[in-house]
């Protein structure tokens, strides 16, 4: 879990208002983490945490791409 927090902090540093209207962050996940996100509820929980940790504005679309079907979430304030 600690390494996951480090990843989110790194993403927070990479996402800045200077990046423009559209920013794409691509992160390679470990196989163990990918296995955990294969469940819909855990994937959506993770996407919601990303919205909160990165302070993404309401209406931001977040997509998790992995071996299975993609998961989508629109951040809400």
UniProtKB/Swiss-Prot annotation:
Domain of life (superkingdom): Eukaryota
Subcellular location(s) of the protein: Secreted; Cytoplasmic vesicle, Secretory vesicle; Golgi apparatus
Protein name: Surfactant-associated protein 2
GO cellular component, one term: extracellular region
Induction notes from the record: Down-regulated in response to LPS (lipopolysaccharide) challenge.
Statement: the UniProt record of this protein carries the keyword Mitochondrion: no
PTM comment text: N-glycosylated.
Signal peptide region: 1-19
Alphabetically ordered keywords of this record: Cytoplasmic vesicle, Glycoprotein, Golgi apparatus, Secreted, Signal
Location, primary (coarse class): secreted
Tissue occurrence: Expressed in lung, and specifically in alveolar type II epithelial cells.
Summary of the function given for this chain in its UniProt record: Putative surfactant protein.
Glycosylation positions in this chain: 61
InterPro entries with a match to the protein in the record: SFTA2
């Amino acid at each position: 879990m600690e390494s996951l927090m480090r990843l989110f902090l790194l993403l927070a540093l990479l996402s800045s208002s200077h990046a423009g209207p559209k920013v794409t962050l691509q992160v390679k996940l470990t196989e163990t983490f990918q296995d955990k996100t294969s469940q819909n509820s855990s994937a959506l929980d993770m996407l919601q945490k990303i919205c909160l940790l990165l302070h993404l504005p309401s209406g931001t679309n977040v997509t998790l791409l992995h071996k299975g079907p993609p998961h989508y979430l629109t951040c809400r304030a």
